[in-house]
């Protein structure tokens, strides 16, 4: 058996979001599957402004991801993409009915992401939600929204468009 030695500056910790554990030492926990639904151009979405979608097809996708999770032993997180807050509300209502685990909330629209935080708290989903993402593009208003709401899990996107690669990512994290 080949052993790979990892050395970390900081202690590796785990987090638990709605029963799914993330992090820790490499190999300590299984990889988490994150399947995206309702993304731009997704064939099941009929109107991405209003959140109209083919419910039966969406249910099949969530069921299939659940099956893959059982087959592989890897837990899964539902990654919900929404262009608008009204669409997100409909997608969250759907997710609450068909899925009991954690979900990632995502949008290319900064205002939708910020308003989503209030919506998640209002609907009581904050403890199941993972915000996507804190990045170099996060402005003060979005950061304030993160601090003022109950969602306490987020993805940090350490991408540096001015300096792609590990060194650039490290500079983003350090600054």
Predicted regions: what is each one?
Residues 2-63:
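N-terminal amphipathic alpha-helix/helix-capping segment at the start of soluble metabolic enzymes
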Residues 23-25, 96-97, 122-124, 146-148:
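Solvent-exposed alpha-helices and their adjacent loops that cap or buttress functional pockets
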Residues 28-33, 73-79, 102-104, 126-130, ...:
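Structural preference for beta-strand elements that scaffold enzyme active sites
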Residues 36-50, 70-76, 95-98, 156-157:
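Gly-rich Lys/Arg/Thr-decorated short loops/hinges at beta-loop-alpha junctions or inter-strand turns
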Residues 36-39, 81-85, 108-110, 134-136, ...:
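Active-site beta-loop-alpha junctions enriched in small/polar residues
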Residues 51-66, 88-92, 166-175:
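Well-ordered, non-membrane alpha-helical segments in soluble/globular domains
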Residues 63-70, 76-124:
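N-terminal active-site wall of soluble small-molecule enzyme domains
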Residues 124-128, 134-175:
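Conserved anion-binding
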């Amino acid at each position: 058996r080949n052993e790979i030695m990892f050395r970390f500056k900081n202690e590796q910790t785990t987090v638990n979001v709605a029963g799914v554990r993330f992090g820790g030492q490499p190999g300590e926990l299984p990889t988490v599957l994150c399947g995206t639904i309702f993304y731009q151009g997704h064939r099941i979405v009929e109107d991405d402004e209003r959140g109209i979608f083919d419910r039966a097809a969406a249910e099949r996708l969530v069921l299939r991801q659940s099956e893959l999770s059982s087959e592989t032993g890897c837990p899964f997180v539902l990654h919900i993409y929404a262009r608008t807050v009204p669409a997100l509300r409909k997608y969250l209502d759907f997710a609450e009915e068909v899925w009991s685990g954690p979900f990632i909330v995502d949008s290319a629209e900064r205002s939708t992401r910020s308003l989503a935080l209030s919506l998640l708290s209002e609907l009581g989903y904050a403890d199941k939600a993972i915000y996507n993402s804190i990045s170099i593009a996060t402005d003060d208003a979005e950061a304030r929204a993160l601090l003022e709401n109950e969602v306490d899990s987020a993805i940090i996107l350490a991408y540096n468009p001015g300096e792609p690669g590990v060194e650039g990512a490290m500079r983003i994290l350090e600054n």
